[in-house]
Amino acid sequence: MSRSAEVICVGTELLLGEVLNSNAQFLGQELARLGIAHFHQTVVGDNPTRIKRAIALACQRSQLLIFTGGLGPTPDDLTTETLADFFQAPLVNHPEILEDIARKFAQRNRVPSPSNDKQALLPDGAQILPNPIGSAPGIIWHPRPELTIFTFPGVPKEFHRMWQETAVPYLQSTGWVTAQIYSRVLRFWGIPESTLADQVAPLLALTNPTVAPYASKGQARLRISTRATSQETAHQVIAPIEQQIRQICGLHCFGGDDETLESVVGKLLQQRGETLAVAESCTGGGLGQRITGVSGSSTYFLGGVISYTNAAKRDLLKVNAADLEQYGAVSAIVAEQMAAGVRSQLHSTWGISITGIAGPDGGSETKPVGLVYIGLSGPQGTQSFEYQISPLRGRDWIRQMSTSHALDRLRRQLLADES
């Protein structure tokens, strides 16, 4: 008989939308990666009657139940005792759990409260899943021969670590994992998802590996997946398809897996021993924030200027006052002067600038909201690029897209210099 897993996330805060249920997303990805069938997810509030109904339904259709949330010390943390009550199992006290909690509290110069005592009560026969970070341990439990139950705290940082350190090895050693799904995600910029899908259409019909397009935050992606017994075997299947895609899509493909535009640009600058400075107006430091979010960016990023006013552009970046008056701050010539100015002032190899209208106010018929100019100044001169970003998704979207366009322009220039 085929076996499947089911996810049950406990917490009224999830139902009310007060907390994003990232644990469900994480488990969906992990179960898919491990090749474990997974057909149902449930979110249930902190109510023992409704939790029992969720358990009863899950037991009818799944053999692996994974609970997140409801393991804390407060009265509305009910997962453990509700499970014990449903399966008519007594709760057993584990002094070693209280000792672990006391030790963790002592490291913070605190002492546990009496409410923490309930976290040491686990169903009879359950195996403790240690929590290396927080106070709430989880369990592995077999209340019935054909049923396995995991419980985890709802705090994502705690849950993710416990999952990787205890649950995954257990599933691998007990026959739940026979062949994993390995995936390679390719990331693209400057090409819509629909256009990308058209270009690689023959590859989308493949069955091993499979190729699937999707988009996130304006960025098109392709996931290449195969089921294999090892990373090496998977690579042999995936690599030729990745090579085909890169040949088809050219510079639109900027990286893979966890790579970002800023990390790719940083790597290129490091390889060349070159430096970067930025001048920002409408993005208000967003470009610099993305660049400095990459570990090691201090080796190539010298700094930036947020020149939000015309006076700042003139005084800090040496933008020509007459050009500001004639063409306005949102113009190609000002973007170029900003990029050249910050490059000169900070003595960097490259200077990037962004000036535009992020909205929702400030637009006009000739310069609508979403109009953005990117300036790029380097050893071979200075140029600018005009973008009209849709204002329908708001100010933050325009600012985010602007920083991505700026990074992509520098990436393309760096690659062009190498060819």
Curated annotation (Swiss-Prot):
<dbReference type="InterPro" id="IPR041424">
    <property type="entry name" value="CinA_KH"/>
</dbReference>
<dbReference type="Pfam" id="PF00994">
    <property type="entry name" value="MoCF_biosynth"/>
</dbReference>
<dbReference type="InterPro" id="IPR036425">
    <property type="entry name" value="MoaB/Mog-like_dom_sf"/>
</dbReference>
<comment type="similarity">
    <text>Belongs to the CinA family.</text>
</comment>
<dbReference type="InterPro" id="IPR008136">
    <property type="entry name" value="CinA_C"/>
</dbReference>
<dbReference type="InterPro" id="IPR008135">
    <property type="entry name" value="Competence-induced_CinA"/>
</dbReference>
<dbReference type="InterPro" id="IPR050101">
    <property type="entry name" value="CinA"/>
</dbReference>
<dbReference type="Pfam" id="PF18146">
    <property type="entry name" value="CinA_KH"/>
</dbReference>
<protein>
    <recommendedName>
        <fullName>CinA-like protein</fullName>
    </recommendedName>
</protein>
<dbReference type="InterPro" id="IPR001453">
    <property type="entry name" value="MoaB/Mog_dom"/>
</dbReference>
<dbReference type="Pfam" id="PF02464">
    <property type="entry name" value="CinA"/>
</dbReference>
<dbReference type="InterPro" id="IPR036653">
    <property type="entry name" value="CinA-like_C"/>
</dbReference>
